[in-house]
Amino acid sequence: MLKPLGDRVVLKFEAEKEQTVGGFVLAASHKEATKVGTVVAVSETGIRTITGDIVPPSVAVGDKVLVEYGSGLEVKDGDQELVICREADILAVLA
C-alpha cells in the first residue's frame, strides 16, 4: 500500500456513471470537470504552516471526495489504479 507524504492523499476513483442517484443524466462537460473518489490513504503528518504549526489532514480514510478532473498523479499499486493528489485538490467531502 502507498503511504502518502506531506499534504498528499491517495484516492481510488469509482467507475463513472451515466446517471446520478437522483436519476439525473449528467452533461458530458460536467462528467469531465469532476470525479468522485474514495480516500484510501492519508499522510500522517499533514502540512506545516509558515509559523511552524502542523495542520492535520481534514480528510480520513474511507471519505468519498470530489476532485477536479485530471488532478493528481495516476499510479498502479499491484492491480489497483490509484491517484496521488494534494489535499488542496479536493473540492468537497461527500456526505
UniProtKB/Swiss-Prot annotation:
Disulfide links within the chain: none
Pfam family, one: Cpn10
GO CC list: cytoplasm
Primary location: cytoplasm
CDD domains in UniProt: cpn10 (cd00320)
Location relative to the cell: Cytoplasm
Keywords for the protein's UniProt record, in alphabetical order: Chaperone, Cytoplasm, Stress response
Known role: Together with the chaperonin GroEL, plays an essential role in assisting protein folding. The GroEL-GroES system forms a nano-cage that allows encapsulation of the non-native substrate proteins and provides a physical environment optimized to promote and accelerate protein folding. GroES binds to the apical surface of the GroEL ring, thereby capping the opening of the GroEL channel.
Family designation: Belongs to the GroES chaperonin family.
Protein name: Co-chaperonin GroES
The species this protein was found in: Streptococcus equi subsp. zooepidemicus (strain MGCS10565)
Gene: groES
